[in-house]
Amino acid sequence: MKHAKQIAEHATIQSFLNCYLRETGSGEWITEDKRIEDIFYHLFQRDTCSTYLCCRLSAQNITLYGEVIYKSPTDRHLFGEQFYYQMGDSNSVMKADYVTVITFLIKEMSINYGEGTNPAELMLRVIRSCQNIEEFTKERKEDTSALYGFHTSFIEAEQSLLFGHLTHPTPKSRQGILEWKSAMYSPELKGECQLHYFRAHKSIVNEKSLLLDSTTVILKEELRNDEMVSKEFISKYCNEDEYSLLPIHPLQAEWLLHQPYVQDWIEQGVLEYIGPTGKCYMATSSLRTLYHPDAKYMLKFSFPVKVTNSMRINKLKELESGLEGKAMLNTAIGEVLEKFPGFDFICDPAFITLNYGTQESGFEVIIRENPFYSEHADDATLIAGLVQDAIPGERTRLSNIIHRLADLESRSCEEVSLEWFRRYMNISLKPMVWMYLQYGVALEAHQQNSVVQLKDGYPVKYYFRDNQGFYFCNSMKEMLNNELAGIGERTGNLYDDYIVDERFRYYLIFNHMFGLINGFGTAGLIREEILLTELRTVLESFLPYNREPSTFLRELLEEDKLACKANLLTRFFDVDELSNPLEQAIYVQVQNPLVREVAVRS
């Protein structure tokens, strides 16, 4: 097996280069070029590489070359181990390590984009991301059954993303966790930790709940049912009184104790720091949402860490957004659950925090439903965990599932893949597109927000999670308001249709569906073009329900190019997209494979 350092560096080049090619439109795919063959005859193994990438960096008069293992119709390609560069017209070439390749690419962007960029910050994040991938790979390389097994639990899947977002330039960059604490808080290292508790007088508490009990009652009840909590603690703190108990992530608790306003509350006697207690909760893929299979609820915390592009903070409007999403399902909009019984939401129906004027206090805690309680945790996996690249020498989890089913059913992997994909679209894509066209409600359904429950290897239930992930179309405002008064206004989730179209297309189609299709293709299970045709057919079936002024369907089915989130440029300009209105990431025009590949097949 390759060394963890080699694996991490190759994964880093691959994700960064795929972002660069997509977002800048650079790169040539060369299959027959004698001059290049002459240069690389002794460098590339001709029997394993029939396609080269040639990427010209004109501003520096440099050309990068790499071997292409798999060229993808959805534009996430697989590259070989070796990269080389050529200066000007010289016939000599030099081998390039990952730092050299990425330095060249960042320098080219710096020259082309000029002011307003932050190349040093980007380079730092790339290196740290690579170092984290190396650590995760080294620690988990023998843990293949949990990473890629036919059967896994919810938390095993959540903790399986060793490489992270496959089309992000810094998928595992984290700023704010000390290295020696990484194992405790990182899902990739099976992190788990006790929660730290604060006791707050009701005069400074802000809580809401759409459940039968208040948030305070729910949290105290969880502690009373925890065998790891002492009777003395329960007797002292878990009674019905004028105080609330707030669980806080350990990193956030440490940060809060250094804040002057928190120290003032403690001095005034309205706040008490109790410390850690109870069972250890496990880190999910988002780091800040913690889970335990014996807890009725997951807990989503503010978290003083910058992950990929953004600080992870529960904003006040997001607390309300969780309740709004839960309330929405009790209106006519909730008919989507009856019409598509394989589709469901993981809601955030309660929250608690401390009042600190009009801004966040840092005590924001979101109560999230936990459908993966006890034995229900079996075979529930986020989509990103199915298609995550495997450690060299292993298959992805999706590949292992399809191969096992093919063996059991005496069918080809292609036949099983096609059936699996069709079943999956029935419980995920179809209900979300229907809800969007019918009610103007879009979900930020990317791979990490999408959890699928499997039965005998096949998808039977889809769950959407994320209280930050609702968009409501302005054109449907009157209808939505009739269902739920003031929907989207307090939470800031109402947008013009063209904005919602763009976001919905990226998250549901580019990130989620194209990402899943790419996972089938890169694993050699089925040609991506076949699944793209299936996807297009399903989208076409919704044309009779098309809703103006939305152009969601028309552009997907007709436009050669579409707006796609540019993770590299967003990172390059150091944009914190979660702190900006309209989720102000940078979007660029990219090729639409639903048009391009269908045209090629025709």
Swiss-Prot record:
Residues binding ATP, per UniProt: 286-288, 300, 312
Disruption of the gene: reported phenotype: Deletion of the gene leads to a decrease in siderophore production during iron-depleted growth and attenuates growth. The deletion mutant cannot produce petrobactin on iron-depleted medium. Mutant produces the petrobactin precursor 3,4-dihydroxybenzoyl (3,4-DHB) and bacillibactin. The deletion mutant is severely attenuated for growth in macrophages and virulence in mice. In vitro analysis show that mutants grow to a very limited extent as vegetative cells in iron-depleted medium but are not able to outgrow from spores under the same culture conditions.
UniProt KW keywords: ATP-binding, Ligase, Nucleotide-binding
Biotechnological applications listed in the UniProt record: The ability of the enzyme to catalyze condensation of citric acid with several di- and triamine analogs of spermidine suggests that it may be a versatile biocatalyst for the preparation of highly enantiomerically-enriched citrate derivatives via a novel type of desymmetrisation process.
Biological or metabolic pathway of the protein: Siderophore biosynthesis; petrobactin biosynthesis
PANTHER family hit by this protein: L-2,3-DIAMINOPROPANOATE--CITRATE LIGASE (PTHR34384:SF5)
Molecular function GO terms recorded: acid-amino acid ligase activity; ATP binding
Class of enzymatic activity (EC top level): ligase
GO terms of biological process kind: siderophore biosynthetic process
Main function: Involved in the biosynthesis of petrobactin, a catecholate siderophore that functions in both iron acquisition and virulence. Catalyzes the ATP-dependent condensation of citric acid and spermidine to form N(8)-citryl-spermidine. It can also catalyze the condensation of several di- and triamine analogs of spermidine with citric acid and the condensation of the citric acid analog tricarballylic acid with spermidine. Required for growth in iron-depleted medium and for full virulence in a mouse model of infection.
Domain of life: Bacteria
Protein name stated in the entry: Spermidine-citrate ligase
Reactions catalysed: spermidine + citrate + ATP = N(8)-citryl-spermidine + AMP + diphosphate + H(+)
Record-linked Pfam families: FhuF (PF06276), IucA_IucC (PF04183)
Entry's family note: Belongs to the IucA/IucC family.
Gene source species: Bacillus anthracis
EC numbers: 6.3.2.-
